[in-house]
């Protein structure tokens, strides 16, 4: 039975059914990609942009690829065969409301399509109000958000690990069945073998405690255990977001210049990094006034007028199925929460630095 399952998976690979979904970062995609039964952990300090990175790499870029692959007109333009992959995303936004998430995503999409920046604060009328033309732009994206709702389910507010596990089981049973395959083993059969289901938790530090898991560590351990089960039994792809602990900024590490993220820097529990197949970390070296380990000129990635920082370092700390300890420089536009891979240090030009700060870099495809 075990070899038959392995053979079926190998055949799926030969048929191109295990290629997965691109994350929108070409260099990163050489090492990792979105496919079934993978557990991702993404960490960073507050303000590092980890939620924006999750949204870019695991939600918006995959979604845009998915609708492009499955839209006949787009397939004709790109001369591609519509993908058989079906994408489903369950997004547990425990820190931000559903309305805020959608506003951020629309703001990003308007900028990509139109080159117009409408910050979330303006979109929602917190301070300034949109002009008539800006409002007309916003209304153009109703169908885009409607298409999102067919693929992405946003659930806001904290929950405990058992509650989330029950919801994942209910979702699995709505989209498949569980059978007893022999005396000892059960197996889950999805209705659609080509469906990739991402389960995003932002962030695990907000998992609620219970009587059975009264401490934060126990709650996170339980959640990671349930995510591992969802990966192994249902074939789901969990993506957990985690805060770093404070040791990354202690005086001794700052003095030694040793502030680059390590596995030990993930807060509260070691279970998440042990259970995850892939561990990624975002780091803002400007925050600690240290040089970038890859050698980018950080002074040229800082807007001297506004103080906006346009750089983050992404490190692939753990990769169970390939190369790790990989660093990639990312240009970061915080106004709309957008990331884009920078040229390698040896290839970056003066015009690249300038384009990043004046934001035209983010519009180049």
Feature locations, PLM:
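Signature of the SF2 helicase/ATPase Hel1-core->accessory helical subdomain module
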Residues: 206, 243-250
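Helical hairpin unit composed of two closely spaced alpha helices linked by a short loop
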Residues: 179, 189-228
